[in-house]
Amino acid sequence: MLQEVVYCGICSYPPEYCEFSGKLKRCKVWLSENDTELYAKLYGNEIDEEVANAANKLGSSSIGEAREEKLEKDLLRLQAKQENREQRELAKKLSSKVVIKREARTKRKFIVAISGLEVFEIDMKKLAKTFASKFATGCSVSKNAEKKDEIVIQGDVLEEVEKYIHSLLEEKGLKNVKLEIIDSQKKKKKPTDEANSNNNNNNNNK
């Protein structure tokens, strides 16, 4: 009757030859866990301290590998979640718009109000200071009718503000964001200009 030959799961040698594999400690651990009778035959009934320590280390290593694998999966999941959130934020930004409005004030003076910038994580107060310095005029941040922050600039600087906001958004990679320009009251001709224009037309008709 043929006797079944056992081969070590670590070095693939028969257990009797594991000492020549250079992996004896791990081989003994494997054998103690998979064939206690053969282990007892080769090494005695008691598992020596060295084998027990090796078994503990291997166990810890397995736990460490499992933990590392779990951490890696969690990290990938968090990265995917972060990417999805960033994509949603970008879509929100691209679908938003910045409103630049020119309004007439008394004595033929104008103000320019800018709203909608908070979506793009722009520091409104800092930008207001930049405008105040750039245009040498009064500039402040206040709440509009929709209870949202808007920058109010004293002066007729609509075109300059539009160009500046365009370049500011382009720097943030948002050149496709819509700018809505509202001119609530076009600049009117001075009465003297209108009178002169009418006189010229009358003279030409003579």
Swiss-Prot record:
Domain notes: The SUI1 domain may be involved in RNA binding.
PROSITE patterns cross-referenced by the UniProt entry: SUI1 (PS50296)
Principal place of residence: cytoplasm
Gene3D superfamilies from the UniProt entry: SUI1-like domain
Domain of life: Eukaryota
An annotated GO cellular component: ribosome
Region listing for Disordered, in residue ranges: 184-206
Keyword entries, A-Z: Cytoplasm, Ribonucleoprotein, Ribosomal protein
Gene Ontology MF, one: mRNA binding
Subcellular compartments: Cytoplasm
Name of the molecule in the record: Translation machinery-associated protein 22
Positions of the SUI1 domain: 98-169
Subunit structure: Interacts with the 40S ribosomal subunit.
Keyword presence, tRNA-binding: no
Keyword Ribosomal protein in annotation: yes
Family, similarity comment: Belongs to the DENR family.
